[in-house]
C-alpha cells in the first residue's frame, strides 16, 4: 500500500463545469457503470472506508467528486452510468457534464474505467472508452469483483478484454481487482504513480503484456 494515496481528502463536488477546481496540476478520473464497484475501488486504493461514498440507489449521484492527494494531484470520481431508471433529463445533463470534463480538462492525465469482471465491456463502457480514444487519454481497466470468480477465469477475462480493446484501436492496460480482498492494489498504484508523475516507469503488470 503506497502511503501517498492515504492522504486523499475530499475537495469538492461539482454539478457544473464552473464549479470544477482550477484546471492545473494532474488528475486521474475513475468512470464506471453503476454498481461496478467504482467507489469501493477508490476507497481501497486510498485505504479509506468512506472517501468515495457508495450509494444504495444506483444512478442517484450525478456529481463529479474531486479528491486532493496534494497541492497539484487529484483523483476524480465521475458519476456512475448505465442505470436504466435514471430519468432522461438527468441522463442528458450527465452526458453533457461528462463530455465537457473529458473533452476540455487539460490536467486530465488518465482514465480508469471500472467494470464488473463478470459483465465487462457494456455498451456504456464502450461509449466511455470511445470518448477516451477521441481525446487520446491513457486508459486503465479495473475488472472489479474478481473475488467472485477463480483466478484462472479472471486472468482469461482480463486477456479477452485487453484483446477486444486492442482490436478496437484502444490502447489500455487491464487488470483483475478485488476491493473485498484488496487484490490488485499495488498494480493499480503503479499505473496511478506513472500518470501522476510519481515514478518514471509503469509498475503495473498489464494483462495484455
Swiss-Prot record:
Domain of life of the organism encoding this protein: Bacteria
MF terms in GO: GTP binding; metal ion binding
Cofactor dependence: Mg(2+)
Transmembrane segments: none
Database matches in InterPro entries: G_ENGB_dom (IPR030393), GTP-bd (IPR006073), GTP-bd_ribosome_bio_YsxC (IPR019987), P-loop_NTPase (IPR027417)
Keywords: Cell cycle, Cell division, GTP-binding, Magnesium, Metal-binding, Nucleotide-binding, Septation
One term under GO cellular component: cytosol
CDD domains referenced in this protein's UniProt entry, alphabetically: YihA_EngB
Residue sites binding GTP per the record: 32-39, 59-63, 77-80, 144-147, 177-179
Domain EngB-type G positions: 24-198
Pfam families attached to this UniProt entry: MMR_HSR1
Stated family: Belongs to the TRAFAC class TrmE-Era-EngA-EngB-Septin-like GTPase superfamily. EngB GTPase family.
Main function: Necessary for normal cell division and for the maintenance of normal septation.
PANTHER family, per database record: ENGB-TYPE G DOMAIN-CONTAINING PROTEIN (PTHR11649:SF13), MSS1/TRME-RELATED GTP-BINDING PROTEIN (PTHR11649)
Protein name (database record): Probable GTP-binding protein EngB
Gene from which this protein is expressed: engB
